[in-house]
Regions:
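Active-site regions of metal-assisted phosphoester/phosphodiester hydrolases
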Residues: 1-34, 42, 59, 63-227
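Phosphate-coordination/substrate-recognition cap region in phosphate-metabolizing enzymes
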Residues: 52, 56, 60
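Short, flexible/disordered intra-domain loops and linkers
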Residues: 44-51
Length: 227
């Protein structure tokens, strides 16, 4: 199973043009089963989604999990995309603590690899806030199956510190430097893999239009069920 995470910066590329189809082409090349998006909606008014759902499905086979009743496809900019073949159970929108508004989306999935919980999030700019937010996510996940993956923009520049709170229950996967897309210097985007799942491959996707579609590069991870 391939999971991807991608901060798409509202589909505004390094040429400062909003080009949703360019993002969709990158997602098509990623060929992931599920995707956590960050900055997936516009920030004004009703915050409409930036990716047209019809074109998204036609190019990638991915559908947006409907977690709102309005034109936005997500929550605090987060959106989850799921390929056909995965059944979606309970979904939940989480507000995260901190100085700035942050959130996460949580979904129970059932498919070819069994059941699991996926969390997509975009953590805050201050390390203290990020640690509070991770603690909140761990509390929410504590009543669910340990087969869980957290995916998103962790906003953590250090490859060594800042996510220590996860290490007891999760393996943190940092595929590589994903920001800034023009010259990657920081591993801001990461995964955390819970018990019962094993990472068998991961990377930063730099092919095709990924270098100019957003200020972040997408990351991917392949996982398997543990026997």
């Amino acid at each position: 199973m391939r999971i991807a995470s991608y901060n798409i910066r509202k589909a505004v590329g390094l040429d400062w043009r909003r080009n949703p189809l360019r993002i969709i082409r990158v997602l098509e090349a990623l060929d992931a089963d599920v995707v956590a998006l960050q900055e997936a909606d516009k920030r004004l008014g009703a915050r409409p989604a930036v990716l047209p759902e019809k074109a998204l499905f036609e190019h990638t086979g991915l559908r947006v999990l409907n977690v709102t009743n309005g034109p936005s496809s997500g929550w605090h900019g987060n959106a989850l995309l799921v390929r056909e073949g995965w059944r979606v159970g309970a979904t939940e929108r989480l507000s995260l603590p901190g100085i700035e508004p942050r959130g996460a989306l949580m979904a129970d999935l059932e498919g070819p690899m069994g059941t699991m919980t996926l969390v997509g999030t975009h953590l805050g700019l201050r390390r203290g806030c990020r640690q509070l937010q991770l603690a909140h996510l761990l509390e929410e996940l504590s009543v669910r199956s340990p087969r869980a993956v957290i995916a998103g923009d962790f906003n953590e520049w250090s490859p060594r510190i800042g996510v220590d709170i996860l290490h007891h229950d999760f393996d943190v996967v940092s595929p590589g430097r994903s920001f800034h897309a023009s010259r990657p210097v920081a591993p801001l985007d990461r995964f955390a893999v819970g018990r019962g799942l094993t990472m068998v491959g991961a990377g930063v996707f730099e092919d095709g239009e990924a270098r100019r579609a957003s200020d972040h590069l997408p990351i991917w991870m392949d996982i398997e069920s543990q026997p």
